[in-house]
């Protein structure tokens, strides 16, 4: 699956996107754990639940199952004005 990082999140990860195998994360909760382990500086943001996740361009909830073909976008809250 492909993970895409946006805004200041990609500054923390130092990459815009990466590919991971499904065996690292079968659902969104497992993916969050994987990301925290790989990028510890994101932990405080994950714990506050301020990051937003979209799977194949649809907002996702924690227990959403993942597939190898999925594209996951991770981004901060968006505000307008």
For each predicted feature, which ranges?
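Ubiquitin-like/PB1-type beta-grasp interaction modules and other compact soluble beta-rich domains
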Residues: 1-79
